[in-house]
Amino acid sequence: MTGKTFTAILAGAVGALMLTGAALADPAQSKALVDAAKSRGDVGEQYDGYLGFVKPASDAALKAAVAEINAGRAQLYREAAARNNVTPEAAGISAFKTVVQAKLAPGEYYKTPEGAWVKK
């Protein structure tokens, strides 16, 4: 499979995951918690394709929502990697570059490969 095809498949899958909150017990509530935290600058998107905490979190519900979303993304990246003969890490990075970064709203944070949080 070509890199372009892999990117297209991964982009569609990640987009669906971001919209549905796949594998979450209460996707709407978890997505709402994470979206609010992203708006406040508490949670951001990392270069590896996972959510991360820009600021230390004390809210157990938010921590659980981030962990659940990241678990869903990890499963997606493993599946995409197996189908496309790449590592899950490469799939996560590709998802960030092709889908996640483009969906960041102004004011939201993302983490660079060097580890710095940057406000969009």
Locate each region found by the language model.
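Amphipathic, charged alpha-helical segments and their helix-to-coil junctions
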Residues: 27-64, 83-84, 88-120
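Short, well-ordered alpha-helical segments
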Residues: 66-81
